[in-house]
């Protein structure tokens, strides 16, 4: 097989793969609401679009929403949802459905740092209910709330964060903290600025 191109992640591309594979599904310069996405977000989205087959740019929706949420201090607005839809050339309802379905996305303003305590079976059997109580007491808030200073958002119950062997565990800004104790929790939360 003869290879004619190299993708952005240095994979060889066969001539049978259309150039759309390495070209984002949007114009070079964003127009309309897509302008709301900053350059870093657009670069991140473009990077992920190239990883999917031609015409499958919808598959990059989750990473596009993550980039948009990150640029907006941890939550998505209606305008950002529409910007992602326009940038990926998708119907806005498809983007909204993804954002509303996954617990990693917040559709309302919240604290800068996102804290998720896993409460699924492995964590529950290892005391996640006590972990949630401890974190709520330490922060002075309930799940689904942010600290008054806007520093920390304690997400609602998380069914599984896929780290069962490290139960009980929590995720803070996409970083796992396993085998939790009150001392570990204090250290992690106190280091958040």
Regions found by a protein language model. Give the residues of each.
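Signature of N-terminal electron-transfer/Fe-S-associated modules in redox systems
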Residues: 2-193
